[in-house]
Amino acid sequence: DQVTSDLAGAAGRIALERAGLQPDDLDRIIVATDTPDYLSPATAAVTQAKLGASHAGVFDLNTACAGWVTALDVAAKTIVTEPEERFVLVIGAYGMSRFLDWGDKKTVTLFADGAGAVVVGAGSQPGWLATVTAAAGEYHDALGIYTGGTYRPATTANLAQYGPPHVQFVRKFPATFNTERWPPLIERLLAKASAAAGTPLRLDDV
């Protein structure tokens, strides 16, 4: 019966313990999830309360499967640009079992529940070198949970017509989607990281 904030809190406590920190040492908590406890308030606020991290500012971030790495990027840039913020707790939490149609083999074999967390802070050695981001918004209607938001509220009529909120594949992605989209991103990232590191980086260095 664990909800997303329970998973996030458990991962956050482990990360704090391994970092040798207390909840009140945190300046910010970012929870990356597309399965929040509620539409509002933020799951990060619920997690803050469960951790007892009363000093930390909080927000959720939703970029679906890319959520955790996006949150990590935001945290790293926060540490660089906000010197008074020393520690940011980044949590990726997934409670997708609540949104599965157990008769749909396309989704039940892909999605599950879990959480992971890290504490991001300044260090004496170079850490986060570079980020590149991209999105294919034209496929927003291909895979997702389409009931429960403002587009299709969870009204009695919509639930009767579409059923409860479930993750679903609506249409296929092109077979060449990954092979066409990823290599240019990797090349851009290596170029950007090379500039930040002051030395050329190649795939063999990764």
Question: Over which residues does each language-model region extend?
Answer:
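Acidic-glycine-rich active-site phosphate/pyrophosphate-binding loop
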Residues: 38-52, 90-96, 150, 154-160
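Beta-strand segments within the central parallel beta-sheet cores of soluble alpha/beta enzyme folds
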Residues: 24-32, 59-62, 85-93, 129-132, ...
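Flexible, glycine-rich active-site loops centered on histidine and acidic residues
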Residues: 78-115
